[in-house]
């Protein structure tokens, strides 16, 4: 019975966090080096939803994490899945960076 109550409380908290707007108390300056407005400090006030807050946080990052890069891998031209590389016998090609252009 106690486990069901804990599960119910967690589910209600998750649903309420997703549906209700997030309130950011006060404001905080965010410095952005590569912003379109010249990198001026921007004041983050009350946001209308949690999605807006997460977008602002992602805009202030200086790097792209590896998980974001993994999800956008280009497909092979023939549509077949990629085979794992054999690091001992993978050969030399333009893709591996050791290929020499002799033309």
UniProtKB/Swiss-Prot annotation:
Signal sequence, renumbered to the chain: 1-32
GO biological process, one term: calcium-mediated signaling
Major localization listed first in the record, in broad terms: secreted
Any single GO CC term annotated in Swiss-Prot or TrEMBL for this entry: apoplast
Compartments it resides in: Secreted
PTM description: Proteolytically cleaved, probably by S1P, a subtilisin-like serine protease (subtilase).
Molecular function terms from GO: hormone activity
Propiece residues: 33-58
Site positions (Required for proteolytic cleavage): 55-56
Pfam families: RALF
Paired cysteines (S-S): 92-98
Keyword annotations of the record: Disulfide bond, Hormone, Secreted, Signal
Top-level lineage group: Eukaryota
Entry-linked InterPro entries: RALF
Function recorded in the entry: Cell signaling peptide that may regulate plant stress, growth, and development. Mediates a rapid alkalinization of extracellular space by mediating a transient increase in the cytoplasmic Ca(2+) concentration leading to a calcium-dependent signaling events through a cell surface receptor and a concomitant activation of some intracellular mitogen-activated protein kinases.
Entry similarity comment: Belongs to the plant rapid alkalinization factor (RALF) family.
PANTHER family: PROTEIN RALF-LIKE 14-RELATED, RAPID ALKALINIZATION FACTOR-LIKE
Protein name: Protein RALF-like 18
Encoding gene per record: RALFL18
């Amino acid at each position: 019975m106690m486990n069901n109550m804990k599960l119910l409380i967690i589910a209600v908290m998750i649903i309420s966090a997703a549906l209700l707007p997030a309130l950011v108390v006060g404001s905080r300056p965010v410095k952005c080096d590569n912003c379109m407005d010249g990198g001026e400090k921007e004041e983050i006030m009350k946001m209308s939803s949690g999605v807006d807050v997460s977008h602002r946080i992602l805009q202030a990052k200086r790097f792209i994490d590896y998980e974001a890069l993994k999800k956008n891998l280009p497909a092979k031209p023939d549509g077949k899945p990629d085979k794992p590389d054999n690091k001992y016998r993978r050969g030399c090609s333009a893709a591996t960076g050791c290929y020499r252009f002799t033309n």
